[in-house]
Regions:
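Thiamine diphosphate
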Residues: 104, 113-114, 118-119, 259, ...
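Glycine-rich phosphate/diphosphate-binding loops that line cofactor/substrate pockets in enzymes
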Residues: 13-23, 66-71, 95, 153-158, ...
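Phosphate/pyrophosphate-binding active-site segments
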Residues: 2-5, 177-178, 200, 299-395
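Conformationally flexible catalytic loops at phosphate/diphosphate-handling active centers
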Residues: 149, 153-204, 357
Length: 465
């Protein structure tokens, strides 16, 4: 066994690894199955902020929002059994949104496993379908190794959640073990042949349409894609709830493909002769139930850029498949020699005009005019304001009429999970305290997570709800 920093409990070693991996905030509901870890977190309170939530779903939704905003794995901790079940909602959201997350779950003592002990759950079975990986740390001397693995898996390739089970007796074991190094994220770099193939498709296209979405973006990647679209006369649509990846005020913006998609935009998608899909999986919501793009071979030429090779060709067969991080592809696209034939200028102008026309309501409102509310918010809120949007029909107002202008100004679950907006807004205000945060939530979502307002008051988070 490697020697490290003297004898430490498994729980202390775990918290030490969190510090090493750059964790500054943890969202949790305390429970008796991980008391040793809680004690170590108390000792580390000057380095790691522990936010004690009112319900585990609130904790995992806050961790998911943190992961979206920062690009780093959000960290949640819940207790065994019922706590793990409550927390699964935010984990599922992280999986469908490709958000990096690590959730630590207390577990029964090792000598009580496989007896259906009090609150025992097999997390490999329960979490296996909604996590990239599920691991259990049975030996305290493996804590550095397996925690590092969890962060690496959560942040690499297609990001997503990893569940780590920590038996309560393992946390008390005393070990002398070396710490891990800070985890690193593996990113794929685009190659010259892939860019040559992409350029070849764009060169012969008269009606290209780019669709941006998914995870792995950065402010630089968004700026580079915008520069590419400008230089090459390509209209850009956003996949479901990803409008903040392209400035909605920009002349190349064509609107969102989702529940509030303009009929003219869906018609334009069908009319396009080339789809350049960057970061999006082309899921059900973006493709109108897989009806807007034919399966498995699209009627258009398809260039599909994604950070994980396993997703390319999984549903739609691309003509050009590019495995690359968003920053790598966007940078290469920006630097590519521009091709902007005059024939595409009108195509871009019409796409943007269709989007602007769709900002006008088609029905008169009775009572509160939500379109007018969105107009006021568009005028009054700064460009970097963060909007958190819950699930339900009401969310269509912010989806259709609010104009997102900067990267990471929208937090919304593509899984359609109700109860997200309030905890996400609380997390956003704690994570980015210099940015105003507005949460849109319906009566159902508010009933599901409204208790987290008490968490907001306790920790000084003050979003507008």
């Amino acid at each position: 066994m490697s020697r490290g920093n003297g004898l430490r409990s498994g729980g202390q070693v775990l918290v030490d690894q969190l510090r090493i991996h750059g964790v500054d905030t943890i969202f949790c509901v305390p429970g008796e199955s991980y008391l040793t870890v809680i004690d170590a977190l108390h000792d580390a309170q000057n380095e790691i902020k522990t936010v004690a939530c009112r319900q585990e779903g609130g904790a995992t939704n806050m961790a998911e929002a943190y992961g979206k905003l920062t690009g780093k794995p959000g960290v949640a901790m819940v207790t065994r059994g019922p706590g793990a079940c409550n927390g699964s909602i935010g984990v599922h959201t992280a999986m469908q949104d490709s958000t990096p997350m690590v959730i630590f779950i207390g577990q029964v003592a090792r000598d009580q496993e496989y007896r259906e002990a009090f609150q025992e759950v097999d997390y490999h079975k329960f979490y296996g379908a909604i996590c990239k990986e599920v691991v259990q740390i049975d030996h305290a001397n493996r804590v550095p190794e397996l925690v590092s693995q969890a962060f690496h898996v959560a942040a690499s390739g297609r990001p997503g959640p990893v569940a780590v089970s920590i038996p309560e007796d393992m946390q008390r074991d005393m070990v002398d073990v070396a710490d891990a190094r800070p985890f690193t994220t593996v990113r794929s770099e685009v190659g010259p042949q892939a860019m040559a193939d992409f350029r070849g498709q764009l060169a012969v296209s008269e009606r290209p349409l780019m669709i941006v979405g998914g995870a792995g973006w950065s402010e630089k990647a968004c700026a580079d894609i915008q520069a590419f679209a400008e230089a090459n006369a390509v209209p850009v649509a956003a996949s479901f709830r990803c409008q903040d990846m392209f400035d909605n005020m920009h002349a190349n913006y064509a609107g969102e493909l989702g529940t509030s998609a303009s009929p003219k935009l869906t018609a334009r998608l069908k009319e396009a002769d080339l789809l350049i899909v960057v970061g999006s999986r082309l899921g059900e919501m973006t493709t109108g139930g897989y009806s807007l793009v034919s399966l498995p071979v699209p009627q258009q030429k398809l260039v599909h850029v994604y950070m994980d090779a396993a997703e390319l060709g999984r549903v739609y067969e691309p003509d050009v498949a590019i495995v690359a991080s968003m920053e790598s592809f966007a940078g290469a696209a920006k630097d590519m020699e521009a091709m902007s034939p005059d024939s595409r200028t009108e195509w871009v102008r019409e796409a943007n005009q269709d989007y602007i026309d769709n900002l006008q309501p088609t029905l008169e409102m009775n009572g509160v005019d939500m379109h007018a509310v969105m107009d006021v918010l568009n005028e009054k809120l700064p460009a970097d304001a963060i909007i958190t949007n819950d699930a339900g029909n009401f969310s269509g107002w912010a989806q259709r009429f609010y104009r997102y202008r900067t990267f990471r100004s929208q937090l919304g679950p593509t899984s359609g999970a109700m109860g997200y907006a309030i905890p996400a807004a609380i997390s956003a205000r704690l994570t980015a305290p210099d940015r105003p945060v507005v949460a849109f939530v319906g009566d159902g979502g508010a009933m599901m997570s409204g208790q987290e307002v008490a968490t907001a008051v306790q920790y000084g988070s003050d979003p507008i709800i």
